[in-house]
Amino acid sequence: PTTVIFPESPMNFMYHDDREFQQFIGDFARRNNVSVLFNSAEPDSTNGKYFNSAVMVGPDGKKLDQYDKLYLLPFGEAVPWVLESIVPAFVGNFSYGREYDLFPLGDAKAGVMICFESHFGQLSREYVRNGADVIIEMTNDGYLGPTPVLRQHLANAVFRAVETNRPVLRVTHV
């Protein structure tokens, strides 16, 4: 393989802030001669918050790129601005991403959707307009259990594949 992709995590990892984690991922990438795509909370230098991000480290162990989640889960990752002063910040306080970044995936280009973003067809369509050959969905569906939501989340990925005519690689805990 040229790339190892991990599912969305419950934000236990902060690549930018954790030198030990950087060393671990870098060593893994170099030892296996692969790129590694994983989920991480990465700092937003404009406001002191963090992004829910997908980070790619190359086979040389160095960070290649980062995508910051554009569509945050209301109340889980961000509080709608109207309610920010009413609802406690611990409910969700991530920054919204600003760019439709693509990652190298072998000879292809990939757009990444993180969890809830699979609900938004405009995201995958924008990736394709920007040159994506494949869409990757990184998600942590383990907390959903055997509920209808689990099946609906999977169905969203199928819709994204059909409407973009691109394969969707779904990486999850379930």
Language-model segments: residues:
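Enzyme catalytic cores with a strong preference for nitrogen-chemistry domains
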Residues: 1-174
